[in-house]
């Protein structure tokens, strides 16, 4: 298939295997969910009654006081007691094999093309590390909420873009499925597009 390069009017030929697949919503959902789950910290920890400090001595005798029987001051029903079903650190990672991940990425890119959310440009580099220069370039493309994909993120582009809201600049190595679906547009340079095609085609 052929994609139009915005600004030049030329076309670029890309593989149907990478950019013209059917949208597999279930697979994309699974991969996106797994990616987000893997990013969870998972360090929450609480103490059970056996882990809370103290409580070794019986607070009062079993019978004769008129009070409810108690064996430890660290019972879950007591203030400062342990937690009944205490949360423990856990790993939320879900297994997604390489074949599934690539298929999901092909599916996402194909859907971006169908929805006309993939914008191909010759390059996104700016001459100076000024936000004004970068926003002018975005304005020319008619985008305000976008993921910018470049083969290599140059220093000027990185500095000029980092203070712009709703815009993220990545190189191809930093590409992930969540970012692709999170932004309204995905602006990709021709060298980056070729690299993505090589990865997915």
From Swiss-Prot:
User: What gene name is listed for this protein?
Assistant: rplD
Q: What does this protein do?
A: One of the primary rRNA binding proteins, this protein initially binds near the 5'-end of the 23S rRNA. It is important during the early stages of 50S assembly. It makes multiple contacts with different domains of the 23S rRNA in the assembled 50S subunit and ribosome. Forms part of the polypeptide exit tunnel.
Name listed for the protein in its UniProt record: Large ribosomal subunit protein uL4
Q: Which GO terms describe its molecular function?
A: rRNA binding; structural constituent of ribosome
Could you tell me which InterPro entries the record lists for this protein?
Ribosomal_uL4 (IPR002136), Ribosomal_uL4-like (IPR013005), Ribosomal_uL4_dom_sf (IPR023574)
Task: Look up the domain of life of the source.
Answer: Bacteria
Q: Coiled-coil regions in this chain?
A: none
| Subunit structure as annotated in this protein's UniProt entry | Part of the 50S ribosomal subunit.
- What Gene3D superfamilies has UniProt attached to this entry? 3.40.1370.10
Q: Which UniProt keywords apply?
A: Ribonucleoprotein, Ribosomal protein, RNA-binding, rRNA-binding
Q: Which GO terms describe its biological process?
A: translation
Q: State a single Pfam family of this protein.
A: Ribosomal_L4
Q: A single GO CC term, please?
A: ribonucleoprotein complex
- The segments labelled Disordered in the record are 39-70
Task: Please give the HAMAP family that the UniProt record associates with this protein.
Answer: Ribosomal_uL4_B
Q: Where is the signal peptide?
A: none
Task: Give the family, as the similarity comment puts it.
Answer: Belongs to the universal ribosomal protein uL4 family.
